[in-house]
Amino acid sequence: MHGSLRLLVLLCWGATLATLATATVLEKSLGTPYIQTSIYGAWWFTGLWVLCALLSAFYIMRSQLYRRLAFILHVAFAVILLGAFTTRLTALHGEMHLAEGNPTNTFTSGAQSHTLPYTITLTRFEVTYYLGTTAPADFIAHVVIADPELASDSGTVSMNRILSRRGYRFYQHGIDEDLRGCTLLVAHDPWGIAITYCGYGLLLLGMLLFMGTDKGFRERIQLFAKRPTILAIPLLIALVGAVGITRASNPSHRASPAAPVANHSLLEAPPASQQALAVSASTAPPKTLPREVAAQFGTLYVYYADRICPLQTVAYQFSLKLTGGFGYRGLTPEQILMGWIFFPSSWIDAPLIALPRGRVRQLFASKNGMVSWREFSDSSYQYRLALPLEQIRRGEYPGNPQGVLAADEKYHLIQSVTSLRLLGIYPLPHNHDSTAIRWYSPVDRLPEALAGQERIFIRKGFDYLAELAVKGDYAALSAAVAKIRQYQQRNATKVLPPAYRTRAERLYNQLARPRPFAFASLSIGLLLFALLTASLAGFLPSQPLWITRIALGLAIVLLAVISGIIALRWVASAHIPLTNGADTMLFMGWLSLLIAILRHRRFTPLLPIGFLSAGFALLVAALGSANPPITQLMPVLSSPLLSAHVACIMLAYTLLSFISLNSTMAILLRCLNRNTKTAIEHLSDASRTILYPALFLLAVGIFIGAIWANVSWGSYWSWDPKETWALITLMVYAAGVHTHSIPRLSRPMPFHIYMLAAFACVLITYFGVNYLLGGMHSYAG
């Protein structure tokens, strides 16, 4: 009976995992609304969870497992499920549109309309912007509540700032184009949220009690660390990052949103460039400015990607987008950009445009994937991508259209540079407000009231610069650049970023190259991994101490370099860099090296495993984006919960990657020499020790993310593919600590094999969802 009950529990949980995984895959093809209704919203899905909970509770009681400290953790999960079930039964979600000055007391949920017990009136709506830009920092609705049962009150609703009244919670959701109205999300779920949050609190309490009082866990943790202080380091970073995010998200001015800086028409060229775009058959290397002069242009400020940054940043992004790297024929990114601006005829035949792999290369008959700008026109002077783009528009393109779209983007990016529309370097006050600045390019439509001399300076300035560049009068050219910089300082001194931030960004542009560090880390890790495996298998003597010391020194150097890159990006962006895939992978590499350095003496394989884990993380960061652009934080990301959520999740993934590499070593030892039982058991003990904090951190990261989602969107769980796979990962790895229920996993080799297979869940959670399945957490877009 006991064995049958255990099998039934395992089958039930297995069916739940299979359902969740299948739903995320089907969502990609069938769409989110269908999956939300047919699976997540179906009563059989709710019943499956209830059945799992009841069977598990019955099994725990029959096995008398309630006498253990871990019982608190199981009760916490039961309370969380009860909260979710309560939300399923009683919660109400909808939308309310507010128009300025019009009292409203109704909101809609689907096709149904619901009445509030009070009236809300929007008195004023405003958008705050990051200083000197048109990038929104927050959307704020000022409202007055007229309640017949309570005193009238006023309040505000903004991103990550909820307005609560008599069980109803209001969240900022959308704005009207005229800025005289907004849409609020309305949530009424007092019981479900309260019960779920109690479950989160009980879960945290259970974890703390388990780590502090469970004798078996404390004995295991001695293998890894005298004190688990290492786990507090990323959380401290998250706390500091939260403060940084809060400060960075405080807007410095309020204004009506200005129109975009430039209408990026890509079909025009300024007078200075029209003749230069003539056909040139020259085979000489592309002409450009000297390195020092081009670098001076890089010190100018430019309005780019909704932020004020050095022109050097634009040059690096331009070079990366075109060539896939940060140079061409020994020229710097600034020289490449200046070459296209001042000497385009010398560049149109240079094969520096990297085409994506696939069918797009066949259109150009390119073998190595590198083409010139001229090759985008065929022998009839027709745009080579015109037909494929039309096929894509009609949905008739035979294959993945991303390659064609990427190539088209590169072509038009060059046009935007040669037409000077990308160069918004001239700041002008907007509406007589010294902090409301618009940045103009030489070809933008300038304000009618602009004085004649200043208008000529902006409109004809680059013609003069082009003339000096062609003449080779670099002294005069440098002086002209200095005048533009003085103009920027005079007109935009209150909104320009601090000098230290600009210096940090310029240095970051030059140093942020994760690819060579990734290969170095992987090479060192593979060498150490092979030496240690051979030593444990008996093929080599014990690893000499000097090898460990050299490896430790290299790890410290690599950690210092990565720390510097992260610090520079943090300073340049004014918020903790944990908001995209490359950032989180860089952080994971940093964590891997930090843990390996601090605890390698207590666990010998930790150093090679740390190098390998860091190397893979850095390689993914390099493949994703060698130098991800620095951007302003989206308003919804300006929450102190974000950094804590990401830090916990990434630390958990780092520890789980350690376990997978540990298991890899154990399996190799088993294959190479069957007389390695002691070493395999030692690796198993280490993995079990690491597994507990990894699971706890993953669980904490998930429920911090749920709280953040509830604060931002009014729903603490929405079955987004990323959060669903994070839950799957937690459930799969949790089996590794339930050796009483799954006795086979108490044996070292089955445990190692299971842990290695379980790591596929981490890979799917991060890479599969981010780049394939999509969702709110996806970086695929």
Where are the predicted features?
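Solvent-exposed, non-transmembrane regions of integral membrane proteins
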Residues: 1-781
